[in-house]
Amino acid sequence: MSPEPVPPPPPPQCPGCDRAEPIAQRLEEGDEAFRAGDYEMAAELFRSMLAGLAQPDRGLCLRLGDALARAGRLPEALGAFRGAARLGALRPEELEELAGGLVRAVGLRDRPLSAENPGGEPEAPGEGGPAPEPRAPRDLLGCPRCRRLLHKPVTLPCGLTVCKRCVEPGPARPQVRRVNVVLSGLLEKCFPAECRLRRLAGQARSLQRQQQPEAALLRCDQALELAPDDNSLLLLRAELYLTMKNYEQALQDASAACQNEPLLIKGHQVKAQALSGLGRSKEVLKEFLYCLALNPECNSVKKEAQKVMCEVLFSATANVHENLTSSIQSRLKAQGHSHMNAQALLEEGDAGSSENSSEKSDMLGNTNSSVLYFILGLHFEEDKKALESILPTAPSAGLKRQFPDDVEDAPDLNAPGKIPKKDLSLQRSPNSETEESQGLSLDVTDFECALCMRLLFEPVTTPCGHTFCLKCLERCLDHAPHCPLCKDKLSELLASRNFNITVLAEELIFRYLPDELSDRKRIYDEEMSELSNLTRDVPIFVCAMAFPTVPCPLHVFEPRYRLMIRRCMETGTKRFGMCLSAEHAGLSEYGCMLEIKDVRTFPDGSSVVDAIGISRFRVLSHRHRDGYNTADIEYLEDEKVEGPEYEELAALHDSVHQQSVSWFASLQDRMKEQILSHFGVMPDREPEPQSNPSGPAWSWWILAVLPLERKAQLAILGMTSLKERLLAIRRILVIITRKMNSRQELANARERNN
């Protein structure tokens, strides 16, 4: 008889809990409560489990600390982490939740800065929205990214102008853009003192990058003589002092910057570095918490803060006072704790301590007792004092002023154009108020196009930094892909056709030269009105024969015709005339008006123009304009007939149409394909032959494909009698058909002879 199988042992229970549930199940309940955001419940579950365990669990201590930190019970959370530290050294990454709780305690979590703006400087207003109205000339000349007066202004492809050091590197801007010559000269003229200040600061930063701190410090001191309260210069000098290990001076400058601009993250970072050099770890942690309160997503600062927390808050956790057990006993009795396992743990600690049975059991007893001491919150007052030493205690001491709790009083850092008032005053030079009250002294010579020698109209800046009128630049690029002034290659600009207006230059002209701009616009409007006239000075393309309703694709590569096509598009007419060249007159007497349907531009500036014939005209006179021909013209229309003449015309129309269809059908397949690919399908016969002023569309299509000399085509184009044109087409078809038949008969005869 085989023995009965032994049942498996029951899962471990949690002896101190009211319900005898497995530890794993209770742990899952706590984790679920934490994930659901019920941190108070999670903390109570983890604490009850720890109190009921015979041996404390480090992972449970960490869970308890995380839950308490999330619940805002920071002194108790600190005790839980102290308990974990007694069971094993804490790692910085284990303190993420505690760090988050401390950051929330600072009181700025509701107004974080974007992770994309780690410097703490206010973001530029969105490019897509309307810009706020500038309050002063200097604000108009400010960089939209750093909010300071433009320094080495660079105009981006989008038309926005920023400081050169504010240009964001990346694959989107493979071509290095140079300083805008026009705007740079304007800044030097209007703000000479501040431009000198920015030059000195730029030289100092350059020397800093070249690892020449002494020379950089000299330039920085010279710049600070001009603007003693400039925060960026104060922080630059603080960084130089850090490099030279002069931590006291670095702390002095960083503190001044933080006092001037409390919401500047970089100021608190530099201050933390200086304090670290002086060994003042608690203050280092405080500055890191300020940084994280301003920008919770700054991971590098978060990691450093967690490292400092290990040093500041948990360095002495292992050295708990020797009489810990008696202290635990007295506090447990005072607070009425009566867990059986807790009392057993205390007795175990006492026995181990008094009997000295072994060093190992003594250490175990003290460790278990100290863990319980911390997780039960018996170290609360000490932990509260420790936190008060690193967190701001009195709003009147400056924190409330630096980091206001009232949302209405707090500066909205994400709103376009809004930065702290202190910020604006500090970023101005000492003479800025005088300069702004006088306004900008501008004249036409400050914004003169080097090509047309007139006021810039629709200013466009090249990558090399030169600014021209849009139309002037396009005309120059028609001839060569080079800058008209410095001869730099502009092949990329020509290929992209990214001619965006330089917004700042246009706005300055609009605000300070309104009368001159009005005169310049009047001249431009007059030119456009003249160019849009479709009877006088009509642009003429001298190239090939064109017919009404027939497609006429063109490859435009000559500079004069590039200009002509561009003007046709800009005026909105999208029309130009097509004529043949004449040996003596220069232009043929008759031509066809074409309408542009599409323009496809190539990187070299040439283009393919898809056009179609619209109407016929006769040239009255012609002349030249900017290299291409123009003409005064009169449009031609067919003379309409009625009565018996109309009946005769209708019969002739049907007959010639049928004759044309038969001729096309008799062509070889290869020739048909060539004709169809170039001219398209033959239009259908129209029921009313006189419905179109230029005549039936099929008649022009057949004239375009018939093998005729240009002189004959031109003569038919100028006819205003539909009957005469149809008779001419019939005669041509008869002649061509006879020739085709003769060739066929000759070919057949040769085959018979062979």
From Swiss-Prot:
Membrane-spanning parts: none
Q: Which CDD domains match?
A: RING-HC_LONFs_rpt1 (cd16513), RING-HC_LONFs_rpt2 (cd16514)
**Zinc fingers, RING-type class:** 449-487
**Region spans: Disordered:** 112-136, 398-439
A biological process (GO) annotation for this entry?
A: spinal cord motor neuron differentiation
Cellular component, GO annotation: cytoplasm
InterPro entries per the record? Lon_prtase_N, Lon_prtase_N_sf, PUA-like_sf, TPR-like_helical_dom_sf, TPR_rpt, Znf_RING, Znf_RING/FYVE/PHD, Znf_RING_CS
Q: Which domain of life is it from?
A: Eukaryota
User: What keywords sit in the KW lines?
Assistant: Metal-binding, Repeat, TPR repeat, Zinc, Zinc-finger
Q: Which PANTHER family match?
A: LON PEPTIDASE N-TERMINAL DOMAIN AND RING FINGER PROTEIN 2, RING FINGER PROTEIN 127
Q: What is this protein called?
A: LON peptidase N-terminal domain and RING finger protein 2
Q: Which organism is it from?
A: Homo sapiens (Human)
